[in-house]
């Protein structure tokens, strides 16, 4: 490439940038040299400064030109002071002028850099713009027009949903909070819904009853209501505490802390049927195909703990076990384990 060394291996944009920087440095060097020459030649305006002379010699020369003939001491001193003051004022004005020109030059450089930086956000856009300026300067004589690259901007057709957006994230967070509160309200409504439960008090034989509770009630509250319902008819229930009553559903002993809502929403499964149905369907597997699973529910049993401990080796108590939410029953069975 012309103007570059034999070992240069840069791109065309790099070459354009190098030529531009060289021209800028050359222009600045010339401007500084002109300022120095101007400051040296400007001394001739008042006739006080000459090349190679000191300030004392300049003052003496000016005093001799201003003083002709005999003068008094007072006139001599006054002229001497006036010439010195005039010399100092001229020097001060020249210094201020040089400083002002230097400040204007620095300001012009800063404005130029700021303009280049603001015109493009990509580094190569500056090279294209300045390169086109140089081409325009070289081709002015041939009458070619300016060829400039337009400023780079955003493409509205580009998908930007994956980019971080604090406003969009705040809206999504607010929507999640709204949906969460709505879901919690709906669950509270479900928990407050009435639930009719068919159960059987079991003391070796069944005594079926129906009672109504809320879906959100735990098993302990249900057994307390059962005790109040059975107390008039069964003396052993009147003297038993709620902690000594067991609720057995589908051959599983449900601990007191679990709620009906929990069993319903999780669609819990027992050994012999679903734990989330509390009405009663007759078991037809004894007269139909037992290999086909039926969605049938049996009346849960309420038993006294003392009776269970005494008869747990006898069917049906021998099949009962503690309910474990993590244990999954793949199929329902009526007899055996």
UniProtKB/Swiss-Prot annotation:
Phosphoserine modified-residue sites: 132
Predominant localisation class: nucleus
A Pfam entry, by short name: XAP5
Keywords of this entry: Acetylation, Biological rhythms, Coiled coil, Nucleus, Phosphoprotein
Loss of function: phenotype: Shortened circadian period. The clock is hypersensitive to red but shows normal responses to blue light. By contrast, inhibition of hypocotyl elongation is hyposensitive to red light but hypersensitive to blue light.
Coiled-coil region list: 13-41, 72-121
Protein name: Protein XAP5 CIRCADIAN TIMEKEEPER
Source organism phylogeny: Eukaryota, Viridiplantae, Streptophyta, Embryophyta, Tracheophyta
The encoding gene: XCT
